[in-house]
């Protein structure tokens, strides 16, 4: 399960950014995952729940946005979404397409409560 190592790095980044912002705690993390990123949301959530204990990210809500896969034909330049004929260009019927979107996995935003807010 590679989600464990992915989530460990994700948490390190989140905690570092939150501490840099002098946050009291992290309340929400918005993540973007491409259709072909190979990341399982439920596994990331489970790993995050366990790994974030005793950190300022404990209890934070993870929100996921999905980016659909998109391809570009290397023969004619046409861009197209994934479909039944995965890598076949619908324009020229060529079999030489590259993925131009859908492999992403990144933190879009982190919502925090800062130290200046009273308890």
Swiss-Prot record:
Presence of keyword Cell membrane: no
Molecular function terms, GO-annotated: nickel cation binding; zinc ion binding
Superkingdom classification of source: Bacteria
One of the protein's GO biological processes: protein maturation
Protein name stated in the entry: Hydrogenase maturation factor HypA
Species this chain originates from: Dehalococcoides mccartyi (strain ATCC BAA-2100 / JCM 16839 / KCTC 5957 / BAV1)
Keyword set includes Kinase: no
UniProt-listed Gene3D superfamilies: 3.30.2320.80
Protein residues bound to Zn(2+): 73, 76, 89, 92
Keywords: Metal-binding, Nickel, Zinc
Name of encoding gene: hypA
Family, per entry: Belongs to the HypA/HybF family.
PANTHER family: HYDROGENASE MATURATION FACTOR HYPA
Pfam families attached to this UniProt entry: HypA
InterPro entries (alphabetical): Hydgase_Ni_incorp_HypA/HybF_CS (IPR020538), HypA/HybF (IPR000688)
């Amino acid at each position: 399960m590679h989600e464990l190592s992915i989530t460990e790095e994700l948490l390190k980044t989140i905690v570092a950014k939150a501490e840099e912002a002098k946050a009291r705690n992290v309340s929400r993390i918005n993540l973007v995952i491409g259709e072909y990123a190979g990341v399982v949301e439920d596994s990331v959530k489970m790993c995050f729940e366990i790994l974030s204990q005793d950190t300022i990210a404990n209890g934070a809500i993870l929100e996921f946005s999905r980016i659909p896969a998109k391809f570009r034909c290397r023969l004619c330049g046409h861009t197209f979404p994934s479909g039944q004929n995965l890598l076949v260009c619908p324009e020229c019927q060529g079999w030489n397409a590259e993925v131009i979107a859908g492999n992403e996995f990144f933190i879009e935003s982190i919502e925090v409560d800062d130290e200046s807010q009273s308890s």
